[in-house]
Amino acid sequence: MRTHSNDQDWVVSWHHSTEKPTGRAHGAAGVCLTHPGELVLISHDGDHWGLPACRPEGNEQPEETLVREMLEEACALVTGYRLLGSSRSLCIEGHERGLVLVRSYWRAEVMVQPYAPRFEVRHRRPIPAAQALNVVRDPDRAGTRVALRALREAGIC
């Protein structure tokens, strides 16, 4: 699927967990589920709700990025995880033309901690997992489609 972000055009694709797409590691995203079956979402603006995700620090492995970022962005302690797949974004027009970014998506069992917003994330919202299709919305249409695919792979919808 095509998208436009930061004055650049991208082609975004989904890859199953058995595939290893090539490109620069661009972080990890978590479909975070609590024991009572709630899905933990975050928002920067209070209007668009999505999966916690961010870039790796140093030489982190994707699993390490997942665990760190879920705690930092959603104040959620990861107790278990399973790789769902990856998104691969190829810049086809713009100053980063040719750049390929790969982000891993994980199903993560979490224990929600008291919320203390830090960094750019201002809102956290646990919702019944069954409501995910009605709530998950990224400002970017391709981002929403990838998040919904991750939810399907996680068995949410």
Predicted ranges, named:
Residues 1-29:
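Acidic, metal-coordinating catalytic segment for phosphate/diphosphate chemistry
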Residues 32-35, 108-110:
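Active-site beta-strand termini and strand-to-loop segments that position acidic
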Residues 33-73:
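Conserved Nudix-box catalytic region and its N-terminal flanking loop in Nudix hydrolases
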Residues 134-157:
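Charged phosphate-binding loop/patch that engages nucleotide di/tri-phosphates or the phosphate backbone
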Residues 56-142:
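Unchanged
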Residues 25-27, 44-46, 51, 78, ...:
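Short connector loops at helix/strand junctions that flank enzyme active sites
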